[in-house]
Amino acid sequence: MSSLSGKVQTVLGLVEPSQLGRTLTHEHLTMTFDSFYCPPPPCHEVTSKEPIMMKNLFWIQKNPYSHRENLQLNQEVGAIREELLYFKAKGGGALVENTTTGLSRDVHTLKWLAEQTGVHIIAGAGFYVDATHSAATRAMSVEQLTDVLINEILHGADGTSIKCGVIGEIGCSWPLTDSERKILEATAHAQAQLGCPVIIHPGRNPGAPFQIIRILQEAGADISKTVMSHLDRTIFDKKELLEFAQLGCYLEYDLFGTELLNYQLSPDIDMPDDNKRIRRVHFLVDEGYEDRILMAHDIHTKHRLMKYGGHGYSHILTNIVPKMLLRGLTERVLDKILIENPKQWLTFK
């Protein structure tokens, strides 16, 4: 679209790409995660229902999806405002808010947060995984889904005039469902018409990212403007990672700060820690993919906020970047990952 071409679309309107600065490409500021509540371990039911307190924070850190209050990030708008001001003070400029239909997207709150903090916020269009799809969503054709995505970018989301600036995160399960496949095809069709950025949440299997890219390609997507999220919990084998990198999408390591003994959403996966993430990013840089890497935290629960002793949205800037420099990555490369790559991805063609 000519009016969008060369611009980035935030919840406050179009901006020049050069205005973004350091950008986190996969975060949540207001959402609910009730659909993914996990029953607590035996004899821990009482703790799971307590308010979040200092004495149970350690338990919540180990069982984040078994505490119902922890899944209500939408209750912390004031704390999020303070976090974004801190993020800006530490050198942050922009943030992509990946909450889509099914996770209680709230574009009014996103607009308020952008106005209050001066942080550029880009909202996400589309649908999360099948478990959150309504009967109406499942009944839609690819053409109808395409129209929904285009409308959320050109006219506004959720009955408002507040426009999304990316499609995604588009949720995919493993195995992929029929409804998710239709939405992927609609995503490709909408992207082909709009020239917009796309971001994908893959299923928790090493084959999922490959399958998703293939479906998008066959439906006409621009893979060079597509992000594959959560690679830190999805592709572990280096050879397999390089095979995937050759497909040309952005490679996102977006779980910085998440260091779990037990990954409740997929217990067979051993979640890497931040040192392993840093080594994996370094590996991709050494292999020539510095222009394809993106980083974020994917905060979506209360316990990861600074208010509750968590790392917050400034963790990458205050802790990860210094460690990366210590490990031999250069300022130039880190500026590429945090400034240039997000800018290139978020700019409409």
Curated annotation (Swiss-Prot):
Annotated compartments: Cytoplasm, Cytosol
Signal peptide: none
Effect annotated for changing residue 26 to F: Abolished N-acetyltaurine hydrolase activity
Transmembrane segments: none
InterPro entries: AryldialkylPase_Zn-BS, Metal_Hydrolase, Phosphotriesterase
Phenotypic consequence of residue 201 to F: Abolished N-acetyltaurine hydrolase activity
Cofactor note: Binds 2 divalent metal cations per subunit.
Amino acids binding a divalent metal cation 1: 26, 28, 169, 298
Reactions accelerated catalytically: N-acetyltaurine + H2O = taurine + acetate; N-propanoyltaurine + H2O = propanoate + taurine; N-acetyl-L-methionine + H2O = L-methionine + acetate; N-acetyl-L-isoleucine + H2O = L-isoleucine + acetate
Keyword Oxidoreductase attributed: no
Function comment: N-acetyltaurine hydrolase that regulates feeding by catalyzing the hydrolysis of N-acetyltaurine into taurine and acetate. N-acetyltaurine has anorexigenic and anti-obesity effects that are dependent on GFRAL receptor and GDF15. PTER also acts on other N-acetyl amino acids (Met, Ile, Leu, Val) and N-propionyltaurine, but at lower rates.
Protein name, entry field: N-acetyltaurine hydrolase
Natural source organism: Mus musculus
Gene that specifies this protein: Pter
